[in-house]
């Protein structure tokens, strides 16, 4: 009789993408031994998942397990990825031998979803290649933010060659870029999954869309793995976060504060919100202006070069002249003022 499990985790969407991989490989490595369901804040990430069966936690034969990933506390010194976190936890808790079958999470789109027009096509009237850009992040982890003006430099550099689509949750910090298609606050989790399915590439810090870039199926006609450029700095050890086909720009080993893995700090300055992230041991020790030095060391030119690699290598084409002309009719003309910049 298969063991009935409800796996629980109530952390951020990026963490839940990691859990999807563990569920996938629980069933692949131990077929017909488990019936699984989940309890997470992100039910949209589990839509069409073939490994889930609705279970009632009140049923006596059902075991509920709060899933964690204590492996993170050894990530600075071990050759392990975030994907291994829940896998190791389940192995220890259930006495199993789960092994990762793929270097990515497990997000499933239906054939109907894949046939729908993207939000970009709905606006443009035709399919246009585009990159998703995330130029901010959650307000509680300011150490992950890069300079808005540098994001703008990147957008400006590729103007007429790449259409950038800016996304971000309304409740998070995502200041407006100029010359982009602005979809900030206009995508729920499932819409973001579908948008990434259609995307040519992703530009972001270490965040949820980075994990989706790897986990979401690549639309036919493109490379086998979706291009993604990640502005990472030195907060996390690179081996814990980076995917093989991404351009992951990190500074591990270049600064004393991250010379032996990541610093795992949370903020550059106190926010006064009562959160433990305001404690001195959670604050960056090397701040340049408003940025941690590890992020300040990464220039717009560094990022442009990494994006351009995908085009120079031939796996991606730039916009055609006609496509570039079409984008001018709907990209954002938003202006922004940074009062801290002189």
Feature-to-residue mapping (PLM):
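Catalytic machinery of carbohydrate-active enzymes
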Residues: 1-342
